[in-house]
A protein has these predicted regions:
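Surface beta-strand/loop "capping" patches
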Residues: 177-212, 218
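Short, glycine/acidic-rich beta->alpha junctions
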Residues: 18-19, 44-48, 110-116, 189
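Acidic-and-aromatic substrate-binding clefts and catalytic sites of carbohydrate-active enzymes
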Residues: 11-17, 41-48, 68-78
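Catalytic-core region of carbohydrate-active enzymes that cleave or remodel glycosidic bonds
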Residues: 24-28, 32-35, 53-58, 62-173, ...
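Catalytic core of soluble alpha/beta enzymes
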Residues: 39-59
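A glycine-rich phosphate-binding loop feature that marks nucleotide/adenosyl-phosphate handling sites
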Residues: 43, 135-140, 183-188
Length: 287
């Protein structure tokens, strides 16, 4: 019952593309129902990346696997990466990504908040970004190959990183439809706020994700245009990453955890405050 087939991993170059076409042609003939995933190489931009994408378009790959293990400044500059991607041709599989800081290639809360902010562009552009996957899932504290990773363990204990909770908050609150969202600031993100919004048809709730990458607490006023009234209480889930270098460890696995609290609604809006370096998620029901 295979649905997807990735051909290669971080391959690039003239000979790779010449040989790849024979695999694609054979798979299309034998199993046209299987989604073929090609590669844009190991880079997130540049000549090899552009050549890889051009080859994937020419050969008709369904998805292109992009990888980016990058520092904070790259993520800061890439919050709108997919807004201007072509809407025709192959779609995107963000197959490996993680944020790290200068000299800090381990998990820490400061990197997690930029991953959360970057994921707003993945969610807003769900028409072009069809799948995502974080960096490696498991790592043993005494025998790891690279960092960061989502879950760390030793022979007896396990710790979920702050990056794990970022992924969990998105995965459990995807929604069924992307909702247009306007932030009345120019330029957007200048104050460190990034956001995305979806509608969950099954739960009949709006899901608004707001990430504050600045160090200052900021006011948040969410208005749902065209909605007469909301349920009296919305549910907020927050992940406080303000202790920049901190993370969960096998010795202290519950240092940073998502926290839930109710928020009073008023008409078709909620007004609250988001702390510095915080990922906040609001589930807002219709009345």
């Amino acid at each position: 019952n295979m649905k997807y087939l990735a051909i290669g991993n971080e391959q690039w170059g003239e000979f790779t593309f010449e040989r790849l076409k024979f695999f694609v042609e054979a798979m299309r003939k034998a199993h046209p129902e299987i989604v073929i995933i090609g590669s844009s190489g190991p880079d997130s931009e540049g000549e090899n990346f552009d050549l890889g994408w051009a080859a994937m378009r020419e050969q008709g790959a369904d998805l292109v696997d992009e990888h980016y293990y990058r520092p904070v400044d790259w993520f800061q500059k890439s919050m709108y990466r997919y807004d201007d991607y072509p809407r025709t041709g192959p779609k995107v599989f963000a197959g490996e990504y993680a944020c790290h800081d200068a000299g800090k290639k381990w998990n820490h809360a400061g990197a997690s908040i930029y991953e959360a902010a970057f994921m707003t562009t993945l969610e807003r552009n769900a028409d072009i970004v069809h799948m995502t996957a974080y960096a490696p899932l498991f790592a043993h504290v005494d025998g790891w190959q690279w960092r960061p990773d989502l879950i760390w363990f030793d022979n007896l204990r396990v710790a979920r990183s702050t990056s794990y909770y970022v992924q969990q908050m998105y995965a459990r609150n995807r929604g069924t439809h992307v909702v247009p969202l306007k932030i009345p600031r120019t330029p957007v993100g200048e104050d460190g706020l990034f956001a995305s919004a979806t509608w969950d048809a099954q739960a009949e709730e709006w899901i608004v994700k707001v990430i504050n990458t600045s160090t200052e607490a900021l006011p948040v006023h969410i208005v749902l245009d065209g909605v007469r009234a909301l349920a009296p209480l919305a549910q907020a889930t927050t992940l406080d990453c303000s202790d920049y270098d901190l993370d969960n460890t096998v010795e202290e696995p519950n240092t940073i955890l998502p926290q839930q609290s109710p928020i009073q609604t008023a008409g078709n809006a909620i007004t609250t405050t988001i702390g510095g370096k915080t990922f906040a998620l609001y589930r807002i029901g219709a009345k």
